[in-house]
């Protein structure tokens, strides 16, 4: 298993303690050790100098819509094809992981099972993204934002 040593980072550990200088040893995709003050003596395949950089635990998005990309009006949710929505959801997953979110709770998506499909691809390692607790299609009352009936559909 690959080992990465991150040296000289300012570490925020989310315990309530003040940030501190130190080293992090990562094995695979898990933090194996945190050494306050630095000086980790463990061997590593890769060493990263994080001087002047900040390390913290991944964040969790508690109300996420992977496929709601640049949505400024209901039309932006309804008019894209299912194929376009798949790519939007994949980009949404990538944007979250790139921003430091390692988990997302899906509130709903523009198409049925969209977050489930993206979650499955992320879990299989074929798509970059956070851990996804997938939600389904948005449920809405008549006339509200999620209503796709003929009378309210802008298509």
Regions of interest found by a model, annotated:
Residues 44, 73-74, 128:
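Glycine-rich, flexible loop/turn motifs
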Residues 53-120, 142:
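Metal-associated gating/positioning segment near the N- to mid-region
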Residues 123-155:
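Metal-coordinating catalytic core of metallo-dependent amide/deamination hydrolases
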Residues 2-3, 11-57:
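Histidine-rich, glycine-flanked metal-binding segment
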Residues 48-49, 105-106, 134:
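General beta-strand structural signal in soluble alpha/beta enzymes
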């Amino acid at each position: 298993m690959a080992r990465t040593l991150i040296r000289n980072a300012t570490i925020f550990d989310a315990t309530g303690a003040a940030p501190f200088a130190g080293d992090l040893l990562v094995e695979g995709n898990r933090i194996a050790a945190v050494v306050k003050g630095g000086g980790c003596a463990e061997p590593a395949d890769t060493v990263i100098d994080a001087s002047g950089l900040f390390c913290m635990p991944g964040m969790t998005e508690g109300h996420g819509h992977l496929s709601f990309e640049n949505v400024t009006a209901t039309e932006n949710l309804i008019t894209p094809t299912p194929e376009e929505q798949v790519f939007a959801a994949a980009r949404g997953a990538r944007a979250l992981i790139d921003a430091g979110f390692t988990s997302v709770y899906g509130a709903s998506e523009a198409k049925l099972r969209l977050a489930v499909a993206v979650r499955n691809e992320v879990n299989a390692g074929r798509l970059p993204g956070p851990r996804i607790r997938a939600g389904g299609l948005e449920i809405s009352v008549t006339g509200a934002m999620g209503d796709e009936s003929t009378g309210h559909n802008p298509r």
